[in-house]
Amino acid sequence: MGATWRSPGWVRLALCLAGLVLSLYALHVKAARARDRDYRALCDVGTAISCSRVFSSRWGRGFGLVEHVLGKDSILNQSNSIFGCIFYTLQLLLGCLQGRWASVLLRLSCLVSLAGSVYLAWILFFVLYDFCIVCITTYAINVGLTVLSFREVQGPQGKVKGH
């Protein structure tokens, strides 16, 4: 049976919009920093709390991996924020669809985002020795979306929906 439309729910809508806004803000900060090396973003609180330094690092593009695997000029070697915008839009759209494949894609994309969040958090703390407020907030949003996606599969007493 095909997928049908439904409301994504207020929590998913709020999380996706917050993630999208933060991803767009990260793109803005990265672009402003590229134009002006002295640019100071609102999220740049100090030397060890600097989102613009994180966004401008080699790990702020293609997760620090794409350039080494596919080359610097690969179309996939984009700012991580671009992937964030795509992810949060996809989460919102898939959250509006009712159907088995939409549910599977929703949960699978959440798990991928969770793995990416753990990887980037490790880079943030143990390689860059930084604290990025925007980054940490997006990781929390990704955890929230993952929890929400798996909760939607179960009914009120923990029973799987539709069974």
From Swiss-Prot:
Q: Name one GO cellular component term.
A: endoplasmic reticulum membrane
Q: Where are the transmembrane segments?
A: 10-29, 81-95, 101-128, 132-153
GO biological process per UniProt? blood coagulation; bone development; peptidyl-glutamic acid carboxylation; vitamin K metabolic process
Description of how activity is regulated: Inhibited by warfarin (coumadin). Warfarin locks VKORC1 in both redox states into the closed conformation.
Where does this protein hold phylloquinone? 135, 139
Regarding the membrane, this protein is recorded as:
Multi-pass membrane protein
Signal sequence annotation = none
Where does this protein reside within or beyond the cell? Endoplasmic reticulum membrane
Here the disulfide bonds are 43-51, 132-135
Which EC number(s) are documented for this chain?
A: 1.17.4.4
Please classify the protein's predominant subcellular localization into one broad category.
endoplasmic reticulum
Give any GO molecular function from the UniProt entry: vitamin-K-epoxide reductase (warfarin-sensitive) activity
Q: Name one Pfam family in it.
A: VKOR
The residue spans the entry assigns to the Cytoplasmic side of the membrane are as follows: 1-9, 96-100, 154-163
Positions in the Lumenal compartment: 30-80, 129-131
Q: Which reaction does it catalyse?
A: phylloquinone + [protein]-disulfide + H2O = 2,3-epoxyphylloquinone + [protein]-dithiol; phylloquinol + [protein]-disulfide = phylloquinone + [protein]-dithiol
Enumerate the residues binding (S)-warfarin: 80, 139
Ordered alphabetically, the record's keywords are: Disulfide bond, Endoplasmic reticulum, Membrane, Oxidoreductase, Quinone, Redox-active center, Transmembrane, Transmembrane helix
- Similarity annotation: Belongs to the VKOR family.
| Record function comment | Involved in vitamin K metabolism. Catalytic subunit of the vitamin K epoxide reductase (VKOR) complex which reduces inactive vitamin K 2,3-epoxide to active vitamin K. Vitamin K is required for the gamma-carboxylation of various proteins, including clotting factors, and is required for normal blood coagulation, but also for normal bone development.
In the record's own words, the domains note is:
Partially oxidized VKORC1 forms a cysteine adduct with substrates, vitamin K 2,3-epoxide, inducing a closed conformation, juxtaposing all cysteines (S-S or SH) for unimpeded electron transfer. VKOR becomes fully oxidized with an open conformation that releases reaction products, vitamin K quinone, or hydroquinone. Cys-132 and Cys-135 constitute the catalytic redox-active center. Cys-43 and Cys-51 are the cysteine pair that mediates transfer of reducing equivalents during catalysis.
Name this protein carries in UniProt: Vitamin K epoxide reductase complex subunit 1
From which source organism is this entry? Bos taurus (Bovine)
